[in-house]
């Protein structure tokens, strides 16, 4: 008997009600009782099973990116980059690969409004012939801190106060003044783009620096950029209040309704590349996740397009159980020494094992669509049917073999063990440059948001903390620092 043929699914439904084990249920409305008024009998197994299943419906919420929406579609290569990478799904223009994408807010809970000022997650899973590839990013090109050691504390500071369960400004300001590299990220978060209009009208970025390797073994650093063909649109404060007040799931609804109506969202994929031999030529560290690569000296190169043309069939199966991890790579794409990326490689998979179990990659939405083979087996919720006798390697009785060798970066490393910051700091220049590109009204809105944050009357936002933030923004842009100090009745200092 085929163990998969009769697996419970909507495609193999019974015409009548059953228990989980398949026994017929003749009454799904009434408990088994002594007489018509009770008490209820414990022997009513269907009642016990129904309640027990209900009690366990919820799984642990993602510690970040809890609120999200997913959609399916395809990625198509439009420009040849085979000279940069040997990744099979990027081998030639015209090649299409199925994808599933999850958009999300970052900090707030699963049921929170989608109009809050918060970064947005932008994660893409490619189902390729060489296995799955996860490109896990955000709608901003940079991050708050450049060392993953600080990530748990950063999330704690952004999350609600553990005593009151309220997100509070003083905690955010108190934590991040210790990390001036966060200024660049705040130039995005407190900008108009801090509240996207919806998921269709926002950029996506791989954020971290990765590595591309071609067939000859030549490697380059790479940054990934998704650009929506319908443009970037944002909600200002009054608009966010109005939209969020009428529908706290507006972005999820917009995504679903647009696809259902045939108005398919589309993004163009671009890359930037740097030869690792030239990484010391820049005034920033290319592996610093708090910095962007200036497009005037490192131009965008077109790669392909992504179209989302199918809604998910089940929210739990294809959104809540959908799991991403930057460690899931393919031949031709590799990690870099980006400190934040290095910690994400471990933390994401570890989080999914906690949330979904050790066999989370067997769930249909996470499983590869191509054949695979290894000796990772058993454990909680194992769903793979195996009938082989040999579960070790190597063996003369098993024909499975090693795959062909694939190129990986061959950088030679020699240094002392150290715990230290990235040597090239330069925390303020890019934040200031970004601010100066805006129109005056956009600058004024940015200033107003910072004045509001620093004017919070909580006594834990001390004069010292305000002074530090004014100093930081003064170093980014002198006029911005002066305006901020003036609104706060303070003296600007650098």
Curated annotation (Swiss-Prot):
Signal peptide: none annotated. Keywords: Cytoplasm, Heme, Hydrogen peroxide, Iron, Metal-binding, Oxidoreductase, Peroxidase, Peroxisome. Its cofactor is heme. PROSITE patterns: CATALASE_1 (PS00437), CATALASE_2 (PS00438), CATALASE_3 (PS51402). The keyword Metal-binding applies. Its EC number is 1.11.1.6. Heme binds at residue 348. It is found in: Cytoplasm, Cytosol; Peroxisome matrix. GO terms for molecular function: catalase activity; heme binding; metal ion binding. SMART domains: Catalase. GO terms for cellular component: cytosol; peroxisomal matrix; plasma membrane. One of its GO terms (biological process) is hydrogen peroxide catabolic process. It comes from the Eukaryota. The active site is at residues 65, 138. Its main location: cytoplasm. Homotetramer. PANTHER family: CATALASE, CATALASE-2. Catalyzes the degradation of hydrogen peroxide (H(2)O(2)) generated by peroxisomal oxidases to water and oxygen, thereby protecting cells from the toxic effects of hydrogen peroxide. Belongs to the catalase family. This is Catalase.
């Amino acid at each position: 008997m085929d163990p998969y043929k009769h697996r419970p699914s909507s495609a193999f439904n019974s015409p009548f009600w059953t228990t989980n084990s398949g026994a017929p249920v003749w009454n799904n409305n009434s408990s088994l009782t002594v007489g018509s008024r009770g008490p209820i009998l414990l022997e009513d197994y269907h009642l016990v099973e129904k309640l027990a299943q209900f009690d366990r419906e919820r799984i642990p919420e993602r510690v970040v990116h809890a609120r999200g929406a997913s959609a399916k579609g395809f990625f198509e290569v439009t420009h040849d980059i085979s000279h940069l990478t040997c990744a099979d799904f990027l081998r030639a223009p015209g090649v299409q690969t199925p994808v599933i994408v999850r958009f999300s807010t970052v900090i707030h809970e699963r049921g929170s409004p989608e109009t809050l000022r918060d970064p947005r997650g932008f994660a893409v899973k490619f189902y390729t012939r060489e296995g799955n590839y996860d490109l896990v990013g955000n709608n901003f090109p940079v991050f708050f801190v450049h060392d993953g050691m600080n990530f748990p504390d950063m999330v704690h500071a952004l999350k609600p106060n553990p005593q009151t369960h309220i997100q509070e400004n003083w905690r955010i300001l108190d934590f991040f003044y210790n990390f001036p590299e966060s200024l660049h990220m705040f130039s995005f978060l407190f900008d108009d783009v801090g509240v996207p209009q919806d998921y269709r009208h926002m950029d996506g970025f791989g954020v971290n620096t990765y590595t591309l390797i071609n067939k000859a073994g030549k490697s380059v650093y790479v940054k990934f950029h998704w650009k929506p063909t319908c443009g970037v649109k944002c909600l200002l404060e009054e608009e966010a209040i109005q939209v969020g007040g009428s529908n706290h799931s507006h972005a999820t609804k917009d995504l679903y309704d647009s696809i259902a109506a045939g108005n398919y969202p589309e993004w163009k994929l671009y890359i930037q590349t740097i030869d690792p031999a030239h990484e010391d030529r820049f005034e920033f560290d290319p592996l610093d996740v708090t910095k962007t690569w200036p497009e005037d000296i490192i131009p965008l190169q077109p790669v392909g397009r992504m179209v989302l043309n199918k809604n998910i069939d089940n929210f739990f199966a294809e959104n809540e159980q959908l799991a991403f991890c930057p460690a899931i790579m393919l031949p031709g794409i590799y990690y870099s020494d980006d400190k934040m990326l290095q910690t994400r490689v471990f933390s994401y998979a570890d989080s999914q094992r906690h949330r979904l179990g050790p066999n989370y990659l067997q769930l249909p939405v996470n499983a590869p669509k191509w054949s695979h083979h290894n000796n990772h087996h058993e454990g909680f919720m194992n769903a793979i049917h195996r009938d082989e006798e040999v579960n070790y390697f190597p063996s003369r009785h098993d024909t499975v073999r090693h795959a062909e060798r694939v190129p990986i970066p061959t950088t030679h490393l020699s240094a002392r063990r150290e715990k230290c910051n990235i040597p090239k700091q330069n925390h303020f220049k890019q934040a200031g440059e970004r601010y100066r590109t805006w129109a005056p009204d956009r600058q004024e809105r940015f200033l107003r948001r910072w004045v509001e944050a620093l004017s919070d009357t909580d006594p834990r936002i001390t004069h010292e903390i305000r002074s530090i933030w004014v100093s930081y923004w003064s170093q980014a842009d002198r006029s911005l620092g002066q305006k901020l100090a003036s609104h706060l009745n303070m003296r600007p200092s650098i």
